[in-house]
Structures are given as C-alpha cells and as structure tokens.
C-alpha cells in the first residue's frame, strides 16, 4: 500500500519523494535549450539539425556559421543557449561539450487564404517549428559510466 503525503494541497506518494531526492543527488552532465514557435518549416530545419548531431560544440558552431541556410542561424542561437545553460547552470566545461542530439518538431500552422481563379481559394499553411538542442559533457558522461 502506498503512503500518500499531502503537500500544498497535492497528494504525492513516498516513492515520488524518494525518486526526486535521488535525482537531486545524481550528477548532471547534460543541458538543453528549446526554441518554440520558430517561423521556419520543420522539413527545412531538419537537414541542418541532422548535420550537427554528435559533433563537438566548436565544430557545430563552425558548420552553422558557414551554412547559407536560415535554419542554421536559428539553430546556432539555440545551441548557444544550450551551451550557456550547461556552463552557467550545471558548471560543465565548454571544451568537453558535444551535441548529444538536435531535433526539430512541428509547431502549429498558420493558415492563410490564397485567392485563385473563378472565385475559388487555396489554403497556404505557414509552418512553425520547435527546435531542441541537448549538449552533453564527454568527461562527466564517462565518469558516470565508470561509477556504475
């Protein structure tokens, strides 16, 4: 039988509290950043996102800097934010960081009407994206694996 603990009007189980305490003591070796509702088609952004997966952060910045695509500029800003989160919030070393994953999900679509001949109309869908970049520290990841 679960023991329910009432806190701030919400019921939480004992196991929930234990899991939360365990997660608080675990070492953090990854950071993430998300840009939501970005005005670019996910299909166009995914090719750029796939090009930086698994690369060192400095190498990924170089790839994005010299890419002529609009998505490269947007993903570069998200990557910069993820690196800042890793350094400032988690105290990770910037030289050891690499792009663990980078993915682009669909956002909502704005629907616009395009007038056509003979009084008809087409619907134009202006797409949005949610861009997520997760960076990890190679050294901290290795140390965590060795402890297990």
Curated annotation (Swiss-Prot):
Presence of the UniProt keyword Cytoplasm in the record: no
Keyword field contains rRNA-binding: yes
This protein's name: Large ribosomal subunit protein uL22
GO cellular component: cytosolic large ribosomal subunit
Subunit record text: Part of the 50S ribosomal subunit.
GO BP term, example: translation
Database matches in SUPFAM superfamilies: Ribosomal protein L22
Function: This protein binds specifically to 23S rRNA; its binding is stimulated by other ribosomal proteins, e.g. L4, L17, and L20. It is important during the early stages of 50S assembly. It makes multiple contacts with different domains of the 23S rRNA in the assembled 50S subunit and ribosome. The globular domain of the protein is located near the polypeptide exit tunnel on the outside of the subunit, while an extended beta-hairpin is found that lines the wall of the exit tunnel in the center of the 70S ribosome.
InterPro entries: Ribosomal_uL22 (IPR001063), Ribosomal_uL22_bac/chlpt-type (IPR005727), Ribosomal_uL22_bac/org-type (IPR047867), Ribosomal_uL22_CS (IPR018260), Ribosomal_uL22_sf (IPR036394)
A GO molecular function held by the record: structural constituent of ribosome
Family: Belongs to the universal ribosomal protein uL22 family.
Species this chain originates from: Thermosipho africanus (strain TCF52B)
Gene3D superfamilies named among the record's database cross-references: Ribosomal protein L22/L17
Annotated keywords: Ribonucleoprotein, Ribosomal protein, RNA-binding, rRNA-binding
């Amino acid at each position: 039988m679960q023991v329910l603990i009432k806190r701030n009007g919400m019921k939480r189980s004992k196991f929930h509290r234990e899991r939360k305490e365990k997660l608080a003591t675990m070492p953090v070796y990854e950071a993430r950043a998300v840009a939501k509702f970005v005005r670019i088609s996910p299909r166009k952004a995914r090719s750029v996102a796939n090009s930086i997966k698994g690369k060192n952060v400095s190498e990924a910045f170089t790839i994005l800097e010299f890419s002529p695509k609009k998505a490269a500029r947007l993903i570069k800003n998200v990557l910069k934010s993820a690196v800042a989160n890793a350094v400032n919030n988690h105290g990770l070393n910037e030289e050891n960081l690499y792009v663990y994953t980078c993915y682009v999900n669909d956002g909502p679509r704005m629907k616009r009407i395009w007038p056509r001949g003979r009084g008809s109309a087409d619907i134009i869908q202006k797409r949005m994206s949610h861009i997520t970049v997760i960076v990890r520290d190679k050294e901290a990841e290795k140390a965590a694996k060795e402890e297990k």
